[in-house]
């Protein structure tokens, strides 16, 4: 599945946002299809009850049971910065081939510095994923070596927070190697990553070889190891997740302390901390479950919030008051601000996005720029002849785009997820 086609979000996500649109920033002027925007905005501060209703609706669309409350976690650590590189790559694609998908800055709260952490292979993994998660190393203290001449480091990652129904399509362990000038200047290292199968008291753990790399001691940069198979095993069997073990040896078999080999551990700079990243794709069973329950949940939420009907009425009054004569079906501005909702502590990017909405008349005769369907044309003719029998066609989105959201979960892991049908690209009569 292409990254721009996430099926996990409901096809009518824009409806839940349209209902309380007067609470956001709604433009009353025309929006032409060539993106020439001339608009005025309604601004007012959300009341507490309105804010809670808005938050509940959008959290439902995002597939989150509650508002994440991450622990204090630096946004400039290596894992969030890597995820931001992926987010930026996605944002470029979502802007459309003409680069005019969004009239508002589709940007993060902060930006990466220096060369990108994400590789071309990571970008390739994105094309078959609808969610990406990064995981921080949970090991705080290294165990004592049972063999004085065998050096290794251990890493452990919590995969218990992965949403149900998500399958791992690719997973990587990433660790940074600094340039070293002394002692091993002309050496070649063999760096090996193992899965810990079983731990023992008094002797070394049972290990399973996952991946290895041969590098020069003078090399510098991120080392990436494939751990896809073991990650899938951990997701299915969480009790078997005993972590990873890394060792460094010279070509003649001498064990080297990873720190002396230039490998950065948990005490190194924040932007060089080791981490794990996994790419996920929702299974078909999970997608069907989302489709069947998503609409029910949002319907229940709206039935509990009668103010949404009042929101629709006020939005209609505001629209009608802007002009004595109703305008033809067109796209209008609607900007959703995550910052205004007070979510800047857990949503890394974007600060908000331009959702837009469709509004206007579908009256006879229908012009070509109205993108009317054949059925809408026939319905318009019948309505023109007998308006009391058949209503006019409705102004609705004809093209919808996806957005990417980058955020922390409760465990301070970073999640990058695609949500389809969140941005109106074009409107027409249906």
From Swiss-Prot:
Glycosylation sites: 186, 301, 320, 371
Biological process annotations from GO: allantois development; ameloblast differentiation; anatomical structure formation involved in morphogenesis; animal organ morphogenesis; axon guidance; BMP signaling pathway; branching involved in salivary gland morphogenesis; branching morphogenesis of an epithelial tube
Ranges where the record places region Disordered: 290-310
One GO MF term: cytokine activity
Signal sequence, start to end: 1-29
Disulfide bonds: 329-395, 358-427, 362-429
InterPro entries hit by this protein: Cystine-knot_cytokine, TGF-b_C, TGF-b_propeptide, TGF-beta-rel, TGFb_CS
Keyword Glycoprotein: yes
Family: Belongs to the TGF-beta family.
Subunit structure: Homodimer; disulfide-linked. Interacts with SOSTDC1. Interacts with TWSG1. Interacts with FBN1 (via N-terminal domain) and FBN2. Interacts with type I receptor ACVR1. Interacts with type II receptor ACVR2A. Interacts with NOG; this interaction inhibits canonical BMP signaling. Interacts with SCUBE3. Interacts with ERFE; the interaction inhibits BMP-induced transcription of HAMP. Interacts with TGFBR3.
Name of the molecule in the record: Bone morphogenetic protein 7
Gene name in the database record: Bmp7
């Amino acid at each position: 599945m292409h990254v721009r086609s996430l099926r996990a979000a409901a096809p009518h996500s824009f409806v839940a946002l349209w209902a309380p649109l007067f609470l956001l920033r709604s433009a009353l002027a025309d929006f032409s299809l060539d993106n020439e925007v001339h608009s005025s905005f309604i601004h007012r501060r959300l009341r507490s009850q309105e804010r809670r209703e808005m938050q509940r609706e959008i959290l439902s669309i995002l597939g989150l049971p509650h508002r994440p409350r991450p622990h204090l976690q630096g946004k400039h650590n290596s894992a969030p910065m890597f995820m931001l590189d992926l987010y930026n790559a996605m944002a470029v694609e979502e802007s459309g081939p003409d680069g005019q998908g969004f009239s508002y800055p589709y940007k993060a709260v902060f930006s990466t510095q220096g060369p990108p952490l994400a590789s071309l292979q990571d970008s390739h993994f994105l094309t078959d994923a609808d969610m990406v998660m990064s995981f921080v190393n949970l090991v705080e203290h290294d165990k004592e070596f049972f063999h004085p001449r065998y050096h290794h480091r251990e890493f452990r990652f919590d995969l218990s927070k992965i949403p149900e129904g998500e399958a791992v399509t690719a997973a990587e362990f990433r660790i940074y190697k600094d340039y070293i000038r002394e002692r091993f200047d002309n050496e070649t290292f063999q760096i090996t990553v193992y899965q810990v199968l079983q731990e023992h008291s008094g002797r070394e753990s049972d290990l399973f070889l996952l991946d290895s790399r041969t590098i020069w001691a003078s090399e510098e940069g991120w080392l990436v190891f494939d751990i896809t198979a073991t990650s899938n095993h951990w997701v299915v069997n969480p009790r078997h997740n005993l972590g990873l073990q890394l060792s460094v040896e010279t070509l003649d078999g001498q064990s080297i302390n990873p720190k002396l080999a230039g490998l950065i551990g948990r005490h190194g700079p924040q932007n060089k901390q080791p981490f794990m990243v996994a790419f996920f794709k929702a299974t078909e069973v999970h997608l069907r479950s989302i489709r069947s329950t998503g609409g029910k949940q949002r319907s229940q939420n709206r039935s509990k919030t009668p103010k949404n009907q009042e929101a629709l009425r006020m939005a209609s009054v505001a629209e009608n008051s802007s002009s004595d004569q109703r305008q033809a079906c067109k796209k209008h501005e609607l900007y959703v601000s995550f910052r205004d909702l007070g979510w800047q502590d857990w949503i890394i990017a974007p600060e908000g996005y331009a959702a837009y909405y469709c509004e206007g008349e579908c009256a006879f005769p229908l012009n070509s720029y109205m993108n009317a369907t054949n059925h809408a044309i026939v319905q318009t003719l019948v309505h023109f002849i007998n308006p009391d029998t058949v209503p006019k066609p409705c102004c609705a989105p004809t093209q919808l785009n996806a957005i990417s959201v980058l955020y922390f979960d409760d465990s301070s892991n970073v999640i990058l997820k695609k949500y389809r049908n969140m941005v109106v690209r074009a409107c027409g009569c249906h």
